[in-house]
Amino acid sequence: MKLSEKIINTILLGILSLTIHVSFAYSAEITLDLSYYNYEEPNFMSDTSDPAFISLGVKNWDLPKNSDSVWNFLYTTELSKGWVSYSGSGTLDKDYYKLRGETYLGYKIEDFISIIGMGYRWLYDDSGGSVSSTGALGYDRKNQLFYVPVGGILDLTDKLRIKGQYNYLILGTQTSYLSDVAGFTDVTNEQRFGWGTDFTLDYKIDNKTSVYSFARYWDIANSDTATGTFAGVLLFQAFEPANTTAEVGIGISYNF
């Protein structure tokens, strides 16, 4: 892990821990959702959910009801498991694991809360030890994205709310565990350019229960080039191709 990634990771986890601790004193929601997922590297490969991703999380998007302050810390956390079908060098079924955490500083103006914060997404592709339909050997992959979410939360009615944000990529790292294939060394690439969007529509059934739908998207440019070795001697260079990720899902939340 490079120094820049360590610094960002430490700051983000510290802010997120403090935010969750403070926010639990006011209110929080448990979330459960199912989603469609598609990751694509054009002309190279694609990973598509088969059948779906399932996610469990905790969030707080509300300001304290009895507070006179227009400022507050809000957050979203989520852990996901996905069953994925790979298409590229043949076909392959595998598992995905995903962790997403975002913390925001919110400012309320009537029915609108503007937000800006820090976000982190960790994604693990568990392909090591697998063999595709054409005999290609699989290897594990880990992706980390550090980003700044900017957007807002608007209460359209007492029951209907929409949240939208633009995600500005600060740093991405892609680790390919090529050592899963005998003779190769692992390779880590940095991703410097990219952006994403995230929209959620939330409908309150009663004071405790809500249903929601969401759509998320990432567009990441080519990474830098890193050097690896084979059999301890032969050098090779590798980069992570430009890629897109799309997610669409529905869920239910409970306020406690």
Task: Walk through the language-model features, giving the residues of each.
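Extracellular loop and loop/strand-boundary signature of outer-membrane beta-barrel proteins
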Residues: 39-48, 84-95, 129-140, 176-190, ...
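Transmembrane beta-strands of outer-membrane beta-barrel pores
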Residues: 34-40, 77-85, 109, 118-126, ...
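Short glycine/proline- and aromatic-enriched beta-strand/turn motifs that initiate or cap beta-hairpins
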Residues: 25-89, 253-255
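Outer-membrane beta-barrel channels and translocator barrels
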Residues: 25, 61-70, 108-112, 157-159, ...
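Residues on the lipid-exposed face of transmembrane beta-strands in outer-membrane beta-barrel proteins
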Residues: 54-63, 101-109, 118-120, 148-154, ...
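Residues that define the transmembrane beta-barrel architecture of outer-membrane proteins
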Residues: 48-56, 71, 81, 93-101, ...
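Predominantly the C-terminal beta-signal and adjacent terminal strand-loop region
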Residues: 186-256
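Membrane-embedded beta-strand positions of outer-membrane beta-barrel proteins
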Residues: 28-34, 56, 73-79, 103, ...
